[in-house]
Amino acid sequence: ILGPVLGLVGNALGGLIKNE
């Protein structure tokens, strides 16, 4: 359960950081 959730969260954070 935590695997996919962490993946989605990491992806979202990565996108925000890349946008900055």
Swiss-Prot record:
Expressed by the skin glands. One of its GO terms (cellular component) is extracellular region. One of its GO terms (biological process) is defense response to bacterium. Keywords: Amphibian defense peptide, Antibiotic, Antimicrobial, Secreted. It is found in: Secreted. Has antimicrobial activity. Belongs to the bombinin family. This is Maximin-Ht.
